[in-house]
């Protein structure tokens, strides 16, 4: 009888000790473990961060870092294999797809800011950029003041769209702002003469130049209107999942792996045209790799 009572006591104690762990378990990690699958959100034309190559394979700087995060998740769950499902997202739908559980993590060219933090979570920063303009070299566009009364394109649902509309209203510049569905469409609008300039993150603008029919026709100009931090989007209020992702990204940055990934996409020829963006690691990026963090600039 005493043995039965003792065994019962051990079982009850074990049950109580397990309860907090279950309560704190990451919903995302549980979903991945139970299904054996993780859904990765990616962009279709955010060169060189996340985009399709000419064989419709997803490639890019951010995509490679996301795969590092997947490896960290696999190790955390002690799984020999995790199936990855790739899902294309746009600037307009990416937040919703993370919120509703369709996408588990999205690493592309998404800015981490305080407004978005009310809707989703963000990983450690993966890139730091400035917002500028792309225009034809002979268009006479040197800075934002030159856009008064002209057609300007940007991509819908981006920080650049918000900044451009705010500038137009506050400075009464009389710009006609065109909001395209993605960066590829934005550049097409510029290329076909429907706009005189394309406002977007500087690295993305260089990416569009890399796939242009004649790259030498285009130039990136203007005073940066903001400094932004790109992060991988996660579901909000899942700190355990964020910790696993952050740990993997931090390891890549502090070990030198991220430097190699950066050099591959920003200092060497890249698909689809084989052009070199020739963007050396900035002081902001050097500081990030030395001391990874998830701070937003606004």
Where in the sequence are the language-model features?
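Immediate post-signal peptide segment of exported/extracytoplasmic ligand-binding proteins
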Residues: 23-55, 140-141, 145-150, 285-298
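Extracytoplasmic small-molecule ligand-binding "clamshell" domains
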Residues: 25, 31-105
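Extended ligand-binding regions for polar small-molecule ligands
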Residues: 64-72, 145, 150-151, 156-158, ...
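A ligand-binding cleft/hinge motif common to bilobed small-molecule-binding domains
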Residues: 93, 107-118, 163-170, 184, ...
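Bilobed "Venus flytrap"/periplasmic-binding protein-like clamshell domains
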Residues: 39, 45-48, 58-75, 111, ...
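Periplasmic-binding protein-like
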Residues: 44, 127-138, 210-246, 268-293, ...
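Acidic, polar ligand-binding/catalytic clefts
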Residues: 67, 79-146, 286-296
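Short helix-initiation/N-cap motifs at beta->coil->alpha
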Residues: 25, 79-96, 139, 177-188, ...
């Amino acid at each position: 009888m005493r043995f039965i009572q003792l065994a019962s006591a051990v079982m009850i104690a074990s049950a109580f000790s397990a309860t907090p762990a279950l309560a704190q378990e990451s919903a995302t990690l549980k979903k991945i473990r139970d299904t054996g699958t993780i859904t990765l959100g990616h962009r279709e034309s955010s060169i060189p961060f996340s985009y399709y190559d000419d064989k419709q394979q997803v490639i890019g700087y951010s995509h490679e870092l996301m795969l590092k995060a997947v490896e960290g998740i696999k190790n955390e769950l002690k799984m020999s294999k995790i199936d990855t499902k790739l899902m294309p997202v746009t600037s307009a739908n990416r937040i919703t797809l993370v919120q509703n559980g369709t996408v588990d993590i999205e690493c592309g060219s998404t800015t981490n800011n305080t407004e978005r933090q009310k809707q989703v979570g963000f990983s450690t920063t993966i890139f730091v950029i400035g917002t500028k303009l792309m225009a034809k070299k002979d268009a006479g566009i040197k800075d934002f003041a030159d856009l008064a009364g002209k057609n300007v394109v940007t991509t819908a649902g981006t920080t650049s769209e918000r900044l451009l509309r705010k500038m137009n209203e506050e400075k009464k510049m009389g710009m006609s702002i065109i909001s395209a569905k993605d960066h590829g469409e934005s550049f097409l609008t510029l290329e076909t003469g429907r706009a005189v300039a394309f406002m977007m993150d500087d690295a993305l603008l260089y990416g569009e130049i890399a796939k242009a029919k004649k790259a030498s026709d285009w130039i990136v100009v203007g005073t940066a209107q903001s400094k932004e931090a790109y992060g991988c989007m996660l579901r909000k209020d899942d700190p355990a999942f964020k910790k696993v992702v952050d740990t993997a990204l931090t390891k890549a940055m502090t070990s030198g792996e991220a430097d190699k990934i950066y050099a591959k996409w920003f200092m060497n020829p890249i698909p689809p045209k084989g052009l070199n963006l020739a963007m050396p690691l900035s002081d902001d990026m050097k500081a990030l790799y030395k001391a990874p963090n998830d701070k937003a600039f606004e």
